Amino acid sequence: MKNAIVIGAGIGGLAAALRLRHQGYSVTIFEKNDYAGGKLHAIEKDGYRFDLGPSLFTLPHLVENLFALFPEEIIDFGYKSKAISFHYFWDDGTLFKASTDSSQFIEDASKVFKEEKSTIKKYLAKSKSKYELTKSLFLEKSLHKATTYFSLDTVKAIVHAPFLGLNNTLNDENSKFKNPKLTQLFNRYATYNGSSPYQTPGIMTMIPHLELGLGTYYPDGGMHRISQSLFELAQKVGVKFRFRESVTNITTSKNKVTGVETKNGSYLSDLVVSNMDIVPTYRNLMKDVPAPEKTLSQERSSSALIFYWGIDREFPELDLHNILFSEDYKTEFEHIFEHKTLAQDPTVYINITSKESSNDAPAGHENWFVMINAPGDYGQDWEQLVEESKKQIIAKIKKCLHVDISKHITTEYILTPQGIEKNTSSYRGALYGAASNNKFAAFLRHPNFNGKIKNLYHVGGSVHPGGGIPLCLLSAQITADLIQKEQ
């Protein structure tokens, strides 16, 4: 039986390990932490449970596909669909509840934003078309293999290239709405890959289709159950885990991978899959291999500053996902990407899993995951930024919800870009690897194979096709397919 080593037990590493196990490999995962899941982790504090990382669940079939590889194994994993994706709030009192039923969304958006139904319907139809035209090429195949470009999917994408909006920004595409609030709502989808709507290409108008066309979901027991259920499955099917054992070097001979080294010794392997961020993979584990500097020096995606608050009352006007919009969205993104700091009036995201899982907070209380988009760590004074941002967030909540939330916070845990990098090795704390702030970004991400070292592969949010749960799972699928063809 051939051996495979996976570096990192994030969602991409777990998925890659399961797919390789299904191919017949003996698989060992090395993980520096004492838990599996990477960013998909959770903590409990003073009677509250908090999911630390990704909070939005879309494309659940990508998780189900992994369970389907091992139908004889029964894992407790369920989820439910959400009728409302987000509650959106503005300072002037405007509230919009975004239905995941497109017809209802069109009806409600037309009423709230005074926009023509036909305009919204056309936009959503275009979003769906872009997604269906590009998903096979951009999300399900390697963009770095010549064979990809001789497929029918590629021909379709090329024929429809003018329709995809590659030469416009997302904001250009969305400014066709008369109401700037609706433009802002759709501009927010740039943050799903850690980018600015004023720079990322118009093709990103396909992202709303994931929510408004294909639906949003909530896993029973919280987002942490996604990573935990895959961890449980991996254990059941014989994947071995070595926790608290950091890989210090990827070993090679004659430009071919031979295994890895850790503080505990050397391990031989027929192939290695790195789920570590691509920058520290080269900088720390491949010091003798010339690094692809152009790839590694790309602008990093946004990070996040997150406050986890136990709240001593309930807010019926809030749902699982809530957005309190900035009054100056463009300035907010300029601060993040150009000035590497935080705006005075940030957009605030509040995720409350106790709305779905009552055990996540004491009776009559709620667990608030309160996040603002942030730049990565470039040596800023995070202690000061945390202090200032907390005041600004409290002020934003007061404007939109008419309550001084500071009087209701019973416990607090804070995660900064520095903390994200420390916990997950994500370079500068970037949540999605490289930003997608230009039309070539998809092609400039590091491939899922290594061009210099044979039998070395890469998965996760810093490589193709990108960050977020669905794309990390797809990166594992692409990589496993490459391995099956090449080995």
Swiss-Prot record:
GO MF annotation, one: oxidoreductase activity
Q: Which organism is it from?
A: Nonlabens dokdonensis (strain DSM 17205 / KCTC 12402 / DSW-6)
Q: Which family does it belong to?
A: Belongs to the carotenoid/retinoid oxidoreductase family.
Pathway this chain belongs to = Carotenoid biosynthesis
- Quick check: keyword Nucleotide-binding in the entry? yes
* Keyword vocabulary terms for this entry: Carotenoid biosynthesis, FAD, Flavoprotein, Nucleotide-binding, Oxidoreductase
One Pfam short name: Amino_oxidase
The main enzyme category here is oxidoreductase
Under which EC number(s) is this enzyme classified?
Answer: 1.3.99.27
Q: Which Gene3D superfamilies match?
A: FAD/NAD(P)-binding domain
Residues holding FAD:
12, 31, 39, 55-56, 247, 275, 431, 461, 468-469
| Name of protein | 1-hydroxycarotenoid 3,4-desaturase
Catalyses: rhodopin + A = (3E)-3,4-didehydrorhodopin + AH2; 1'-hydroxy-gamma-carotene + A = 1'-hydroxytorulene + AH2; 1-hydroxy-all-trans-1,2-dihydro-neurosporene + A = demethylspheroidene + AH2; 1,1'-dihydroxy-1,1',2,2'-tetrahydroneurosporene + A = 1'-hydroxy-demethylspheroidene + AH2
